[in-house]
């Protein structure tokens, strides 16, 4: 089975460069603006789009992403609407992979089988579910693989060589290396340490390794892109979005461009990097 | 309902499941630490020196065993109620006096155990979440005793309504962090503690306050609290020469209840009742996860949760900060579905009345949490015969609630 994610990484390899991966919260600050933003991302240079599914209790997220989730929930975002949004995005865009990222409970309550069927039909390519470690693979990871969706797992600095094989066993699409122990939006790890960690993971897998958490600038994105197969940027984009809102937290005429402009700058940083060391 | 197991005491399984409940639903960063903790606890549990250490601190630092006290005037009052309705019954009510423990509640039993495990693991920094503040006070106390750094997360709403405990924690040298996210109560304090743990995982031990969270916490906390039921068994033998006929305890996450219940789960003659917080009423805002919720996944485990149709966690409400949690320990969810334990609820108003009743009849001011259990005793005991032995877990004392209840009563007198 070849997914949009596999195809995208094969193309990038041919072009000799790393991926620029964006994260935004689905439905932030409202479903219509959120759709307009994700529609603008491929043109701005996003190679893979991650979309957060809002949850009331995002245990691993920092203040920026927490607030984004609140805005989305307050604007009426639900699992059904998130899938609908991706369906609408897919009408004009067939090649950019979309990865849903979130917590397990909303998926569990929606119903795992129904969720996988509907996500696949909407054009979702992969899932990242923060609170499902390999110990709970039977919940969603295995059914997702069977449904033809990539299940992308996080590896962290605490994932040692002994544990890595368990983490990688049912991972597909790519590996998401979280460069620090901490919540989203924390300070960045230095790129030397990231390089060593990526090399360590690559000893255990042939999957692409993307790196996220704490990347805020084009320079930082270049540094990470040089040492990995992709740089993931989330909180900085969420901050650009929230900085464009009015006093009530509502979208303004500036909102879509505020995100797209930052994405374009970050994409340029990634594209100026050399291909990651094989 | 599941088919009944041979023993209700054998859970969880190797992966931390009680039936479909429990498990380990946490971020990858934490998994290696949780596996380390499981190993450390398994070793400690089998180590005679650890058990000896714990027994020593229980006796001389906590002040155990806590008494099992026959509440004579409460019993007489309940017999009068029974007689007035022509039933001529009224169980003999005993109070298991966990409120007499050092720091004022059952929470210290668990914290002692976890801090001794943390010491074995070489951890120097302890974090905890707290609702009513009792778990925070117990944690701050044992951190002071063992010279450990202590950070306690507490919802900003709870910081305001449990001020005496905030002051105590600070006096004991702990740092209290008011949590402003979400609903600013216990569940948000737990989220914030998890965020801290993910960030400082290399040197930090997370001391969870109830029988919830990822495996092995529900099992470990239950084991540490089971001293309540073990003592009750021996004390009732001594007082009455037999087992009690019923047990009753309030449920926030369910640790004081689990501690009392667990040693009796296989004694089929013993009726067991847990009391959740019905807040303003079960059709309004409340914190009764079993009655008003359904199975879901939060804070590292699968259990009954209050949520909406989209799987978003709903706000819980209880007058009592210690019960104001939208979930419940996974073992309780399992005991509920197997039918071994009967779960009831009591409203804010019922708890307030029970609070005053026990204060006036027995000279014991209970915690508002414990008052929820007393509120159901007032109904259950008059229906039982006079030779029925009922044990209520008095999980904590009401000192922390004096300002809050005082304000409410003053407001009503005007
Ligand atoms: C006195 C007292 N009782 C009961 C509880 C509820 O906790 P649990 O249900 O874990 O026993 C608390 C929690 O703060 C408490 O302080």
UniProtKB/Swiss-Prot annotation, chain A:
Pathway: Amino-acid biosynthesis; L-tryptophan biosynthesis; L-tryptophan from chorismate: step 5/5. Belongs to the TrpA family. SUPFAM superfamilies: Ribulose-phoshate binding barrel. The active site is at residues 50, 61. The alpha subunit is responsible for the aldol cleavage of indoleglycerol phosphate to indole and glyceraldehyde 3-phosphate. Pfam families: Trp_syntA. It catalyses: (1S,2R)-1-C-(indol-3-yl)glycerol 3-phosphate + L-serine = D-glyceraldehyde 3-phosphate + L-tryptophan + H2O. It comes from Nitrobacter hamburgensis (strain DSM 10229 / NCIMB 13809 / X14). This is Tryptophan synthase alpha chain. The keyword Phosphoprotein does not apply. It is an enzyme of class 4 (lyase). HAMAP family: Trp_synth_alpha (MF_00131). GO terms for cellular component: cytosol. Its EC number is 4.2.1.20. GO terms for molecular function: tryptophan synthase activity. Signal peptide: none annotated.
């Amino acid at each position: 089975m070849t997914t949009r994610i596999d195809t995208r990484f094969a193309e990038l390899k041919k072009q000799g460069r790393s991926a620029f991966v964006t994260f935004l919260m689905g439905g932030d600050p409202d479903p219509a603006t959120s759709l307009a933003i994700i529609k603008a991302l491929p043109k701005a240079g996003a190679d893979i789009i991650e979309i957060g599914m809002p949850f009331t209790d995002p245990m691993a997220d920092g203040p920026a992403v927490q607030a984004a989730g609140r805005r989305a929930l307050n604007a009426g975002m639900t699992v059904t609407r998130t899938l609908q949004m991706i369906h609408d995005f897919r009408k004009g865009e067939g090649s950019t992979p979309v990865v849903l990222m979130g917590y397990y409970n909303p998926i569990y309550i929606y119903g795992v089988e129904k969720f996988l069927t509907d996500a696949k039909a909407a054009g979702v390519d992969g899932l990242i579910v923060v609170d499902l470690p390999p110990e709970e693979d039977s919940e969603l990871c295995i059914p997702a693989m069977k449904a033809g969706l990539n299940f992308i797992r996080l590896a962290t600095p605490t994932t040692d060589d002994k544990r890595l094989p368990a983490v990688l066993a049912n991972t597909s699409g790519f590996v998401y290396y979280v460069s620090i122990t901490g919540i989203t939006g924390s300070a960045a790890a230095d790129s030397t340490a990231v390089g060593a960690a990526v090399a360590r993971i690559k000893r255990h897998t042939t999957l692409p390794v993307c790196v996220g958490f704490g990347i805020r600038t084009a320079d930082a994105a270049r540094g990470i892109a040089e040492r990995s197969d992709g740089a993931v940027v989330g909180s900085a984009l969420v901050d650009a979005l929230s900085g464009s809102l009015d006093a009530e937290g509502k979208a303004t005429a500036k909102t879509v461009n505020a995100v797209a402009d930052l994405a374009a700058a970050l994409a340029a940083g990634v594209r100026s990097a050399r291909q990651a060391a094989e | 309902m599941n088919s009944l197991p041979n023993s209700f005491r054998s859970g969880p399984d190797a992966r931390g499941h009680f039936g479909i409940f429990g498990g380990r639903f946490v971020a990858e960063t934490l998994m290696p630490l949780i596996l380390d903790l499981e190993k450390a606890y398994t070793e400690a549990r089998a180590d005679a020196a650890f058990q000896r250490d714990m027994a020593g601190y229980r006796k001389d630092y906590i002040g155990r065993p806590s008494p099992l006290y026959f509440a004579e005037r409460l019993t007489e009052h309940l017999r009068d109620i029974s007689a007035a309705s022509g039933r001529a019954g009224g169980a003999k009510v005993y109070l298991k006096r966990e409120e007499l423990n050092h720091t004022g509640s059952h929470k210290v039993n668990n914290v002692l155990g976890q801090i001794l495990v943390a010491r074995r693991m070489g951890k120097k920094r302890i974090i905890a979440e707290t609702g009513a503040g009792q778990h925070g006070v117990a944690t701050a106390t044992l951190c002071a005793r063992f010279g450990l750094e202590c950070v306690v997360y507490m919802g900003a709403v709870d910081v305001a309504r449990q001020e005496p405990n905030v002051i105590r924690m600070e006096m004991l040298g702990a740092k209290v962090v008011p949590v402003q996210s979400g609903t600013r109560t216990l569940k948000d304090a737990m989220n914030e503690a998890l965020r801290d743990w993910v960030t400082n995982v290399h040197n930090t031990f997370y001391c969870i306050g109830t029988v919830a969270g990822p495996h092995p916490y529900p099992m470990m906390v239950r084991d540490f609290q089971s001293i309540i039921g073990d003592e009750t068994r021996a004390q009732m033998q001594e007082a009455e020469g037999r087992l009690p006929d019923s047990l009753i305890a309030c449920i926030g996450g369910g640790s004081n209840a689990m501690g009392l219940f667990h040693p009796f789960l296989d004694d089929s003659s013993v009726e067991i009742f847990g009391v959740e917080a019905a807040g303003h009423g079960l059709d309004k805002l409340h914190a009764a996860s079993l009655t008003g919720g359904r199975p879901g996944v939060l804070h590292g485990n699968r259990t009954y949760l209050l949520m909406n149709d989209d799987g978003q966690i709903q706000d819980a409400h209880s007058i009592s900060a210690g019960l104001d949690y939208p979930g419940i320990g996974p073992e309780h969810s399992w005991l509920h579905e197997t039918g071994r334990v009967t779960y009831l609820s009591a409203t804010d108003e019922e708890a307030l009345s029970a609070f005053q009743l026990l204060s006036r009849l027995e000279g014991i001011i209970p915690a508002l949490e414990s008052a929820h259990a007393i509120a159901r005793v007032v109904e259950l005991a008059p229906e039982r015969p006079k030779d029925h032995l009922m044990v209520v877990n008095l999980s904590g004392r009401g000192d922390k609630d004096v300002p809050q209840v005082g304000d409410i009563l003053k407001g009503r007198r005007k």
